[in-house]
């Protein structure tokens, strides 16, 4: 839904671009064809491999994982924070709030109806889209939107980006943009 799947798709598209423009570097690839479906399969494999690797790394480093809803329960007498995870009581001196993210759905007329009808997509749906669209309008010029725009444009989709701020990638360093 984010960085790793997007980077995987961008890498696939970059390989396709190398095949198409290889003559610039003395390489000719006859009949280069891009399969968005194959790129999606590779993306899923990369994500699964990364998840397995992270799980193995956490286990090797002694990280305990509790599959449960976590709730803050105040402070213990020791000054540490109390956390309930299912039927377990845990303590920690610091808490990282890392609950994942969801796409922000702005109050733009027609967006909710478009989501329900399936023609408006968040980053979650677009990363699972089996057929690349002929045209795509990306509302939002943030990092994820721009990565999606670049990916789809590089595989032949006509892309338009609409950004309300004075520049795209607004959260980046002004010296970069």
Model-identified regions with their sequence ranges:
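Rossmann-like NAD(P)H-binding beta-loop-alpha module
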Residues: 130-172
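Glycine-rich flavin
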Residues: 1-132, 165-169, 174-177
